[in-house]
Structure formats: C-alpha cells, structure tokens
C-alpha cells in the first residue's frame, strides 16, 4: 500500500496517454484522501515529471497537480510549497516552453494566489510566484466570469444518494473550465481516434456472457477519455471557423458516440448486433412507378416461363436459336470396289446388290473426270475380308471416260512395219528385171539406192496410214507386224533363189 500513490502518479503522467486520464487522477485523489501519508511520494513523482523535456508529460503533471489541489485539501498545498514546485514552474515559464504548458502554468498560479488570499493569505508563496512573473512582464490569461471557484463552499444540504448523469457531467465540466476547448488540434483529434479504435477492439473482444470485463482498469480509462474528448469536440465545433478542422471534429464525434453507445449497451446487458455495411439500393428519382412495373414484368416472365416449360414437356428439346440441321438427301458412302485410274477400268466384287445404282458421271467442257457419287448407300452385307478375297468382275456396262486419242485431233503416224514390208516384195516383183550376170553389179546398186530412198522418205512411197483403231490393242498390232515381216522375208528369199541360179556361170 506504500507505493500505490506513486504508481498511480506514474500512470497519470505516462507519455503513452493522449490526454489527461481523469479516472487515474481521481483514483490518485482517493488514495491520498484514504492515506494522507502517501501524498508525499505522489507529489515527489509529479515534480520529477514536471521537469521532463516532453511537453506532453509536463501538461499531464500539471493536470494531476490541479486535481490534487482541488480534492485533497491543505496537505497537498503545503507539499507543493515544501517541494519547491512553485519556483520550478516559474523557471519553466521563463524558458519559453510549449504554449500549452505555459498557458496552463499561468492559469494555475493566478487561480492559486487568488484562492489563498494574495500576499496576506495563508500561503503567500503562491502570490510571490505570481508576482515574480508579473513583474517580469509576463501577461496572464484573462479570467472568465463563468469560472468555478477553486474552493468548494461548505455543504448545507444532505447528499443525494443517487447522483444523476447530468450532475456527473457538470462536475467534470467544472474541472475542465481551465482548459481551452478550442485548442483541440488536428494531432489531438488523431490521438482521440486512436483511443476510439482501441476501445472498439477491446469491447469487441469481451465475452457478452461476462460483463465484468467492462470494469477493467484500461477499459474504464478509455471510456473516460472518450467522454472527455466528446465534450471538447462539441465545444470545438461551436467555436472554430476552420472547415477542415470542423469536418474532422464531426467525424470524431460520430465515432465517439458509437463506441460509447456500444459500451453502455454492454453495461446494461443488451445484445449488441454485429454492425455490417448494408448495401444501399439504387432508386430512380425520375420514375415513381418503376417498382410496380418491374414487379408486373417479373410476374409476366414467370408465367410465360411456366407455360413454355409445360409445353416443352411433350416435345423434344431443341435449341431455339439454331435451327435443326436439314436431312441429308444424298449421303456419301465409301465404295468397297477398286478402280484403275490408268486404264479407267472399275472392278467390283461378284456379288451385286439390287439397291445399288450406277454412278452418275458428268462431263464438263474440258472432259475432266469426277468421282462417282451414289444416291443410295451401299449395304455392307459382307465383311471387309470377304470383299478383299472375292474375284473381281469387269464391269462392261458402266460408261468410261473417253480415251485421250478420242478427245484430241488425229495425228499422222509413220507407216507401220507391215506396210513397209508389204511394199518390198512388190518392188522386187515389178522393178527387178531378169538381167544377166554381167549386169548384176549395176542392178544391185540401183536396188540399194531405191531401197534407201524408200526407207528415208516413207510418206512419198507409201500411202498415209490410218491410226490404229480403238479395238486393236498394242499387242495385236505388234503381232500383226511380226507376221507380215515373216511373210515378206519368206517371199523375198524364195524369189532370190531363181535369180542366183540364173547368175551362176555355165
């Protein structure tokens, strides 16, 4: 218990606080009132914190001293004088400290010297500090008529057992009269927003079935800070002319009201619903009857969809966007037969079908050949192996494409071998005279020259030969030439034998 006041003074001047924590300050006053012996340690800690270089710690120490002087009586006044706190305050003002710290010290000295009766009062040390600064040319802030007296008048009526919320607000407001509400800066607004966020997280983490968690020291301190900031924000909004500062203050006020309402609901045991952002529906301003029309359209679409679904149960499902494909009138099937493209012959199996139609051929102007297309499918009654090993039958009924020599102009061919050989015996029979042995050499030269002319110019000595007929095959023509050549050779050999016998000498 010996260090409770000192520890409480340390917490009241903690640099992590964004402002004076009135709950801790009141707790410090209660400890000193219950045990006045602890006031010495508390004042010692406050003096040390007042000499800090951090202006925030200095202002927190001044608020704690003000609270003790208003609530703890003459013991604290004497300790402030004995610990030489008043000379320290005068030195701080002369060093030109932070404006908020300076204004707070001047306000406290003026209030204290007036409350203690000036130079002839009970504690002239307060007046001496005030007079020293005044003689140094330092101006003190003007006093307001609505300021609350430093000392509370003696009680004349009994204390009401149950205090109302308005009385509590009035008491807190009285303790804040020395503070300038319009001095709330942008940094303090941001610090207050941080306290709101911390309190919101802590309230959300509490178990709804155990409201005792609201009595935790940190939560109580944050709630008191939020209430204090709420009053300062309202004063700021009513007095400031800065639009940006006013907007920030209004936003902070909304957040403060929300978190305090959340705390009050939890304290009363009411279930707090989880706040979730609800989507705002888009509303057309120009049309008033859009909702009714949309409902009617929806009902019409629903009825029409039901009718279509009932009608579609007896019919096949089809895609209304794409029309059904047309039925194929001429299916193309692969023929199992084979075709010789060199000769144009078509080979088919021996088995014939009744429903097979001959392929239709079309002859274009350039006589191009097109593959046949069957009008009806060819039934495959046999297996592929049977179709491969069956004996092909030459189809003579089908019309074949014209031969190349029929589509082209007739050419002039040289005389065949048979024509040449046929001319030779005639020549020997008609042109070779019966000469004697003396004229054999000259006749042989003439015969050789004429045969040479005959072989070099066949068209002059032989009649033009017609091209082979279509029905004659090359093998037949070659065979005929060989036969003619053999006959010619036989006849020439038989005619030369008598001539040789006649040429023999007697």
Curated annotation (Swiss-Prot):
One of the record's GO molecular function terms: ubiquitin binding
Q: InterPro entries from the xrefs? A: ENTH_VHS, GAT_dom, GAT_sf, TOL_plant, TOM1, VHS_dom
Q: Pull one GO CC term from this UniProt entry.
A: membrane
What PROSITE patterns does the annotation carry? GAT, VHS
What are the GO BP annotations of this UniProt entry?
Answer: protein transport to vacuole involved in ubiquitin-dependent protein catabolic process via the multivesicular body sorting pathway
Compositionally skewed regions (Basic and acidic residues) per UniProt: 468-477
Tissues of expression: Preferentially expressed in cauline leaves.
Tree of life domain: Eukaryota
Q: Which SMART domains match?
A: VHS (SM00288)
Q: Where in the cell is it found?
A: Membrane
Give the span(s) annotated as Disordered. 266-328, 351-384, 398-477
The modified positions for Phosphoserine read 294, 383
Role: Might contribute to the loading of the ESCRT machinery.
Fetch the PANTHER family from UniProt: TOM1-LIKE PROTEIN, TOM1-LIKE PROTEIN 3
Protein name (database record) = TOM1-like protein 3
Q: Which organism is it from?
A: Arabidopsis thaliana
């Amino acid at each position: 218990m010996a260090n409770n006041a000192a520890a409480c003074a340390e917490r009241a001047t903690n640099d992590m606080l964004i402002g004076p924590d009135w709950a801790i300050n009141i707790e410090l006053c209660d400890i000193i009132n219950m045990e006045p012996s602890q006031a010495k340690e508390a004042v010692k800690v406050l003096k040390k914190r007042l000499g800090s270089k951090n202006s925030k710690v200095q202002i927190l120490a001044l608020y704690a001293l003000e609270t003790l002087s208003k609530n703890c009586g003459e013991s604290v006044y004497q300790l402030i004088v004995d610990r030489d706190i008043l000379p320290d305050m005068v030195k701080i003002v002369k060093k030109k400290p932070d404006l908020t710290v300076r204004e707070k010290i001047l306000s406290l000295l003026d209030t204290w010297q007036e409350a203690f009766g000036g130079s002839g009062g009970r504690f002239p040390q307060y007046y001496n500090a005030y007079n020293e600064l005044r003689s140094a040319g330092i101006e003190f802030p003007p006093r307001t008529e609505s300021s609350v007296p430093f000392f509370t008048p003696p009680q004349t009526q009994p204390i009401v057992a149950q205090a109302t919320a308005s009385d509590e607000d009035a008491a807190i407001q009285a303790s804040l009269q020395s503070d300038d509400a319009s001095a709330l800066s942008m940094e303090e607004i941001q610090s207050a927003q941080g306290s709101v966020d911390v309190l919101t997280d802590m309230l959300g983490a509490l178990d709804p079935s155990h409201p005792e968690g609201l009595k935790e020291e940190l939560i109580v301190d944050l709630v008191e800070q939020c209430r204090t900031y709420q009053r300062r924000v309202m004063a700021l909004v009513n007095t400031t002319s800065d639009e940006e500062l006013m907007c920030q203050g209004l936003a902070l006020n909304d957040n403060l009201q929300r978190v305090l309402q959340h705390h009050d609901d939890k304290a009363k045991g009411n279930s707090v619903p989880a706040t979730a952002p609800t989507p705002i529906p888009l509303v057309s301003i120009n049309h008033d009857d859009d909702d009714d029309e949309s409902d009617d359209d929806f009902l019409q679409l629903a009825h029409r969809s039901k009718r279509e679904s009932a009608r579609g149960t007896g019919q096949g499902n089809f895609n209304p966007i794409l029309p059904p494909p047309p039925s194929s009138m001429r299916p193309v099937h692969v023929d199992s037969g084979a075709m010789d493209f060199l000769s144009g012959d078509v080979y088919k199996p021996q088995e014939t079908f009744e429903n097979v139609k001959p392929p239709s051929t079309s002859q274009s102007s350039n006589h191009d050949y097109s593959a046949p297309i069957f009008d009806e499918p060819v039934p495959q009654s046999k297996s592929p192996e049977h179709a491969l090993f069956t004996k092909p039958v030459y189809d003579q009924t089908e019309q074949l494409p014209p031969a190349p020599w029929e589509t082209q102009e007739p050419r002039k061919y040289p005389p065949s071998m048979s024509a040449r050989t046929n001319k030779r015996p005639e020549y020997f029979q008609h042109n070779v005279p019966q000469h004697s042995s003396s004229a054999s050499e000259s006749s042989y030269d003439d015969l050789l020259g004429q045969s040479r002319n005959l072989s070099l110019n066949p068209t002059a000595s032989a009649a033009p030969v017609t091209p082979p007929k279509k029905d004659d095959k090359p093998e037949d023509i070659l065979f005929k030439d060989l036969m003619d050549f053999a006959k010619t050779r036989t006849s020439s050999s038989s005619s030369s034998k008598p001539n040789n016998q006649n040429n023999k000498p007697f």
